[in-house]
């Protein structure tokens, strides 16, 4: 595996499987949790390389940080970044293979 493909493989952390994300799949939109430093062109290249599909749009969002307590001290969890990837007409990604 070349260095550029290894970098692209590290961009996508995991697919997001929620009720809302599952409903978006019917509109050819897939939600992934990505590295906080990932840019839209990098996310587009990673999805196209890993899944062999054409991406028409990438929307990103950062979730709000959540407060966590340990004893008396208060800390915060980091803000995860998500990407909503829209695929071209006729393309799809199989997240749940039939077994």
Swiss-Prot record:
Any Pfam family hit: Ribosomal_L23
PROSITE patterns reported for this sequence: RIBOSOMAL_L23
Keywords, ordered alphabetically: Ribonucleoprotein, Ribosomal protein, RNA-binding, rRNA-binding
InterPro entries per UniProt: Nucleotide-bd_a/b_plait_sf (IPR012677), Ribosomal_uL23-like (IPR013025), Ribosomal_uL23/eL15/eS24_sf (IPR012678), Ribosomal_uL23_CS (IPR001014)
SUPFAM superfamilies recorded: Ribosomal proteins S24e, L23 and L15e
GO biological process, one term: translation
GO molecular function: rRNA binding; structural constituent of ribosome
GO cellular component entries: ribonucleoprotein complex; ribosome
Subunit annotation: Part of the 50S ribosomal subunit. Contacts protein L29, and trigger factor when it is bound to the ribosome.
Function: One of the early assembly proteins it binds 23S rRNA. One of the proteins that surrounds the polypeptide exit tunnel on the outside of the ribosome. Forms the main docking site for trigger factor binding to the ribosome.
NCBIfam families named in the record: PRK05738.2-4, PRK05738.3-4
PANTHER family per record: 60S RIBOSOMAL PROTEIN L23A (PTHR11620)
Name the record gives this protein: Large ribosomal subunit protein uL23
Phylogenetic placement of the source organism: Bacteria, Bacillati, Cyanobacteriota, Cyanophyceae, Synechococcales
